[in-house]
Amino acid sequence: MVLVLHHILIAVVQFLRRGQQVFLKPDEPPPQPCADSLQDALLSLGAVIDIAGLRQAAKDALSAVLPKVETVYTYLVDGESRLVCEDPPHELPQEGKIREAVISRKRLSCDGLGPSDLLGKPLARLVAPLAPDTQVLVIPLLDKETGTVAAVILVHCGQLSDSEEQSLQVVEKHALVALQRVQALQQRRPEAVQNTSADPSEDQKDEKGYTAHDRKILQLCGELYDLDATSLQLKVLRYLQQETQATHCCLLLVSEDNLQLSCKVIGEKVLGEEVSFPLTMGRLGQVVEDKQCIQLKDLTSDDVQQLQNMLGCELRAMLCVPVISRATDQVVALACAFNKLGGDFFTDEDERAIQHCFHYTGTVLTSTLAFQKEQKLKCECQALLQVAKNLFTHLDDVSVLLQEIITEARNLSNAEICSVFLLDQNELVAKVFDGGVVDDESYEIRIPADQGIAGHVATTGQILNIPDAYAHPLFYRGVDDSTGFRTRNILCFPIKNENQEVIGVAELVNKINGPWFSKFDEDLATAFSIYCGISIAHSLLYKKVNEAQYRSHLANEMMMYHMKVSDDEYTKLLHDGIQPVAAIDSNFANFTYTPRSLPEDDTSMAILSMLQDMNFINNYKIDCPTLARFCLMVKKGYRDPPYHNWMHAFSVSHFCYLLYKNLELSNYLEDIEIFALFISCMCHDLDHRGTNNSFQVASKSVLAALYSSEGSVMERHHFAQAIAILNTHGCNIFDHFSRKDYQRMLDLMRDIILATDLAHHLRIFKDLQKMAEVGYDRNNKQHHRLLLCLLMTSCDLSDQTKGWKTTRKIAELIYKEFFSQGDLEKAMGNRPMEMMDREKAYIPELQISFMEHIAMPIYKLLQDLFPKAAELYERVASNREHWTKVSHKFTIRGLPSNNSLDFLDEEYEVPDLDVTRAPVNGCCSLEG
């Protein structure tokens, strides 16, 4: 019996202390020297079953853990509610320091008692002053349920160390537990005398007044020393099966939010995965609310089917008894017994046996569950700390960080799928998925920030837990229908920065080990989102710092490569004033004019002439010296690759001028938009290196490091260089603009220059077609944006609208540049595209494909919107026919050599009826 009661004490120590005891854990460090004496003292307290034993055990326990104990008096409440000590018999003083401790309900320490505390000889030895290094402790023990003082212990001992103070706190708690147990046993004995039993042996008392039922339950309590709820359930369920003669018993634990039941143990079997099901279904949920027992006949067919699936056998009988917490008076579990041996149903005696069991073990069960919850929280906190460590080690790459967030969120919540969206202006963008990071912009997911579940969370900033996705009005099930995937439940939570602004949204889909995401998952997600917000914000900040460093590096590189514009240069340019357009060439404003025929030294003046002819200098009151410096600086901002050089920029700018003059753009666009288009044409290829975007990414260049995450690497660099020139002293032609106009001009330039990326053009091509079909609407802002993009692209490809000889020569320049890149790629060990491989490229077919799929559709759209642009489309179509003839000629006569540029030798030219007019600057002879 002593061993059994020792086990009782161990369980009480572990569960009421919620895992704070270290001396029972096998994986903790060895206990301190006083731990053995403390354990013996607590075991003695756990073994008491009467008042006399309690007094002695309390005295022994305090003597074991406190230093220099000389006297211990224990005062217990008697029948008249007085606090009385029996050794020697006397009542607790009604005045003085002892009474103060009782009233305040807190432990009191003093160097001795005063006259009002003394009741003759019993307390005479405690009078002040005491011997040095000694004290009197007045220790009230509080009944937590009633809030009253259940006992008072008076101790004369030495001064306490920190470890002795902790040991005293342990003894206080367990002395109170022992007292409550003794009182419960005293109350139980009269009931045992009154009750009758069918089996006389069950009511037969031993010499201490205990029945067989009492001995069984005491033995069970002695075995409940486990730290985890699973082991405890196994022992309790084994006891219930014996008492009720059931084939199976289980405990259905009620979740904190009262929304689901869970079961981990059935009879002698521990399930591999915890079984959970909603509490809102059937009669089981009513048991939690009504706190009334039910049997099999009370269940719905769905309840029966669910329980049979869980048990794996047919139900013939069932008894369900609610287990109620004494502390909260709420149902914490449902004790279920199934299929009675030798009977068709469970009796009232079985119900009383279950209730009797949990009358004594219910507190241990709730304490164990609370302890297990604390342990779970502890583990989750440790996991969150590890998550924080993992996240903060990936701040250098946002994509890798988001991938880490997805992995950690899925693992923490046991979700099947996780997605993370970042808020980008009015859109939620997902570039990182469970499968990895998406490098191609065309495959990233963009959704409006105010639509769907993620949009709702981003807008409200509140967590959203959806138990049934298909029943929720914000859920779109079209994706499920098309993929065959079934979304059962969703937990979507916001990610905020330090200013509590939403910067992203995380969406968890399908709880793996439960019917839906629980309140615990919500709390965990909320805590997790804090780490996510901090890490993402710092990662973006880190990225900005790196970008600033890259920009600084680029600025230095540009300054080293280019020379500043001297005062002599712009003075010479403006010496004779701005030349009229008509003085340049009589056909300068015609589509047939080829700008490459103009000497390069005259192009800067031609730019000024066009700006003056379009009246931008006067309308915007641009300072001519500033404009001259800007034009010269832009010209110097171009490197000298075969094609993407200043003459290309000049040709593109001239075509913009032609569109303005011949298509009357002022009837379609605002002046500031046309001005932005012209300046963008000048700057659209600034500092071009003769290589494309994919090469920058593959070579891991500085440009790729700076712009690859945003896409359009070179185009973003061109715009950045344009801004750098504007910020150069004496070059800001927009300096006198209002703040609003200045911001709009820069926004227009950014959008127009980015539109020179053909990938961007292909993305908006359907929108352009739709605009051409319905007709241009000047009041539609979207039409303005689309038209500017179309005009920029048509300017960029304007060489294809010139005569055949110009087009052929331009092809030679382009492929020289392409083949140079191909040679670099081969040197890097990469395989270049066919069009960039001088040994494989078949230029005529490549040009035909380019004409048919890119150039002709662009100028066809331009013709649909502007009938006067028909000649441009016709000339592009004519050039396409020339390439067809060249291709046919090569097919008949054979390939000239292994060098693809030999396709463009004069020998293989198609005879042209146009006669040569004049030498072309860096290009060819011109036709009319």
UniProtKB/Swiss-Prot annotation:
It catalyses: a nucleoside 3',5'-cyclic phosphate + H2O = a nucleoside 5'-phosphate + H(+); 3',5'-cyclic GMP + H2O = GMP + H(+); 3',5'-cyclic AMP + H2O = AMP + H(+). One of its GO terms (cellular component) is mitochondrial inner membrane. Expressed in brain and liver. Residues 188-210 are annotated as: Disordered. CDD domains: HDc. One of its GO terms (molecular function) is zinc ion binding. Its cofactor is Zn(2+); Mg(2+). The 3',5'-cyclic-AMP phosphodiesterase activity is stimulated by 3',5'-cyclic GMP. Specifically inhibited by Bay 60-7550. When repressed, protected from ionomycin- but not staurosporin-induced cell death. InterPro entries: GAF, GAF-like_dom_sf, HD/PDEase_dom, PDEase, PDEase_catalytic_dom, PDEase_catalytic_dom_sf, PDEase_CS. The active site is at residue 644. The keyword Cell division does not apply. Residues 228-365, 397-536 form the GAF domain. PROSITE patterns: PDEASE_I_1, PDEASE_I_2. The keyword Disulfide bond does not apply. Keywords: cAMP, Cell membrane, cGMP, cGMP-binding, Cytoplasm, Hydrolase, Magnesium, Membrane, Metal-binding, Mitochondrion, Mitochondrion inner membrane, Mitochondrion outer membrane, Nucleotide-binding, Phosphoprotein, Repeat, Zinc. Mg(2+) binds at residue 685. Residues 566-890 form the PDEase domain. Binds 2 divalent metal cations per subunit. Site 1 may preferentially bind zinc ions. The modification Phosphoserine is found at residue 109. Gene3D superfamilies: 3'5'-cyclic nucleotide phosphodiesterase, catalytic domain, 3.30.450.40. SUPFAM superfamilies: GAF domain-like, HD-domain/PDEase-like. The GAF 1 domain functions as a dimerization domain. The GAF 2 domains binds cGMP, which acts as an allosteric activator. Homodimer. cGMP-activated cyclic nucleotide phosphodiesterase with a dual-specificity for the second messengers cAMP and cGMP, which are key regulators of many important physiological processes. Has a higher efficiency with cGMP compared to cAMP. Plays a role in cell growth and migration. This is cGMP-dependent 3',5'-cyclic phosphodiesterase.
